[in-house]
């Protein structure tokens, strides 16, 4: 779910266009258009909503509900809560029994507590004293290492357990904050295959034939470099400079390495694809990918291996 925010007194901006491109690249179809600071320009709320709808017409938010709100007066907040309740009711809830994969967006030290990391828990549960695996997404970093959870906080309060979907702050034992960086990821030990090569399908309608041969890939809070080998207009093979804990169905955003423009979005089809060595192997693989499910096919994978 995304809240697409545009300020009433500023209107659509270059940053709004970047957000629109990311929404399209990720294939997001659940969201609300929120025009903030309505108290500063109440006469512009309707105009800005109409402008946002025009800009989002080619995305999954074309028919999203919209409302104007003010954090100063409280106007529109109740309507926004209602729209959020309605929207959340239509979206499935991740299982607290799934494997944990928490992409880290911050790490810091608190006196008397030690290292703390924050991120969004999208699936699984984290409890005090859990053992997790820390994987770095920085080039040249060491192998995955085990860490222990000393404490858990969510929404500003200490908890024994945090379940999805939640913002979480985890106090970790025996590791300095300086050795953890944005984009690193905490995992259920042994639950994820770390891969450098994946096959993907375009989900944004952009041709992968036109993508530069080297791009920046965004997944979770990580940004890594990848080499791109197109396999037709809709499919490609990505080779990362570091191993990543990806699964079939993951959505990735592709951006230019220089101008940083959003190039498109892709969904992972295979996290352990076959090598393409023989003449014509690329064309044959393109044909295979056209028939592959974005949710995985266990029987097909067993037969292939």
Predicted regions and their residues:
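Conserved Switch II/interswitch segment of TRAFAC-class P-loop GTPases
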Residues: 1-47
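Residue-level marker of beta-strand positions
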Residues: 1, 25, 126, 131, ...
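C-terminal effector modules of nucleic-acid-centric enzymes and ribosome-associated factors
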Residues: 30, 40-45, 51-54, 65, ...
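Short, compositionally biased low-complexity segments
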Residues: 25-28, 57-60, 273
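Short acidic, glycine/serine/threonine-rich loops at helix termini
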Residues: 17, 42-47, 78-81, 116, ...
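Conserved catalytic-core segments of large NTP-driven translation/proteostasis enzymes
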Residues: 38, 54-206
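Conserved residues at beta->alpha junctions
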Residues: 7, 35, 71, 120, ...
């Amino acid at each position: 779910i995304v809240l697409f925010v545009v300020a009433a007194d500023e209107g659509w901006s270059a940053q709004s266009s970047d957000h629109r491109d990311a929404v399209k690249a990720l294939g997001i179809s659940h969201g609300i258009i929120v025009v903030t600071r309505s108290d500063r320009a109440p006469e512009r709320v309707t105009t800005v909503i109409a402008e946002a709808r025009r800009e989002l017409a080619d995305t999954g938010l074309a028919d999203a509900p919209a409302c104007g709100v003010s954090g100063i007066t409280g106007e529109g907040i109740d309507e926004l809560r209602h729209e959020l309740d309605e929207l959340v009711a239509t979206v499935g809830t991740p299982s607290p029994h799934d494997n944990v994969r928490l992409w880290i967006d911050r790490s810091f030290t608190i006196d008397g507590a030690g290292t703390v990391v924050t991120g969004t828990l999208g699936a699984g549960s984290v409890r005090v004293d859990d053992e997790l695996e820390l994987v770095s997404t920085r080039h040249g970093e060491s192998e995955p290492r085990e860490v222990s959870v000393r404490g858990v906080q969510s929404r500003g309060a200490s908890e024994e357990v945090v379940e999805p979907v939640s913002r979480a702050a985890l106090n970790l034992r025996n590791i300095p904050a300086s050795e953890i960086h944005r984009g690193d990821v905490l995992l259920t030990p042994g639950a994820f295959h770390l891969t450098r090569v994946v096959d993907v399908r375009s989900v944004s309608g952009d041709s992968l034939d036109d993508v530069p041969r080297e791009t920046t890939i965004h997944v979770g809070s990580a940004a890594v470099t990848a080499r791109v080998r197109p396999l037709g207009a809709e499919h490609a093979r990505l080779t990362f400079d570091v191993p990543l804990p990806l699964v079939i169905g993951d959505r990735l955003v592709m951006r230019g390495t220089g101008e940083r423009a959003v190039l498109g979005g892709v969904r992972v089809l295979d996290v352990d694809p076959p090598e393409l060595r023989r003449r014509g192997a690329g064309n044959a693989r393109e044909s295979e990918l056209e028939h592959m499910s974005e949710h995985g096919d266990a029987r097909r994978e067993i037969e292939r291996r």
